[in-house]
């Protein structure tokens, strides 16, 4: 069965794309009685506040009709930002050579948090170079992944 985030992505992507944006991904963060639905969008020209507002109105209308989340939540629409989240294998392919932090659903070698450079992403397997060793992770076991921002001095 698909996760809530996967179902929301499938439900929202066509409308977001019709507005001219890429739906990068969706995060649903549970926090007691009040949760947050975070929708990340992008386009070649970058994202402005007006873009976020337009997508927010569209997503809000869809959520009101479909009602996939029964408890209270806040809707946030934003660009991926500097510490861009990675959701799909294609994202890892695009950002090959970049440093990434990942958090796993199930630990590997008693660790849930890993940091390394993206080597490849093939057949739903993400390969990272971690301190000179290549480690492989199933995309389905990656709960969260973000690019580590580079700051030039």
UniProtKB/Swiss-Prot annotation:
Keywords: Cytoplasm, Ribosome biogenesis. It holds the Pfam family DUF150_C. One of its GO terms (biological process) is ribosomal small subunit assembly. InterPro entries: Ribosome_maturation_RimP, RimP_C, RimP_C_sf, RimP_N, RimP_N_sf. It is found in: Cytoplasm. One of its GO terms (cellular component) is cytosol. SUPFAM superfamilies: YhbC-like, C-terminal domain (SSF74942), YhbC-like, N-terminal domain (SSF75420). Required for maturation of 30S ribosomal subunits. NCBIfam families: PRK00092.1-1 (NF000927). Belongs to the RimP family. This is Ribosome maturation factor RimP. It comes from Psychromonas ingrahamii (strain DSM 17664 / CCUG 51855 / 37).
């Amino acid at each position: 069965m698909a996760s809530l985030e996967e179902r929301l992505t499938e439900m929202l992507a066509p409308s977001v794309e019709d507005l001219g944006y890429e739906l990068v991904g969706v995060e649903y963060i549970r926090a007691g009685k009040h949760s947050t639905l975070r929708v990340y969008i992008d386009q070649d020209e970058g994202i402005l506040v007006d873009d976020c507002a337009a997508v927010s109105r569209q997503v809000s209308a869809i959520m009101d009709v479909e009602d996939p989340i029964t408890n209270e939540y806040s809707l946030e629409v934003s660009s991926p930002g500097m510490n861009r989240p990675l959701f799909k294998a294609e994202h890892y392919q695009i950002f090959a050579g970049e440093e990434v932090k990942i958090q796993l659903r199930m630990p590997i070698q008693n660790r849930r948090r890993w940091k390394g450079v993206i080597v490849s992403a093939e057949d739903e397997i993400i390969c990272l170079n971690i301190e000179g060793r290549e480690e492989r992770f199933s995309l389905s076991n990656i709960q969260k992944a973000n690019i580590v921002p580079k700051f030039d001095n």
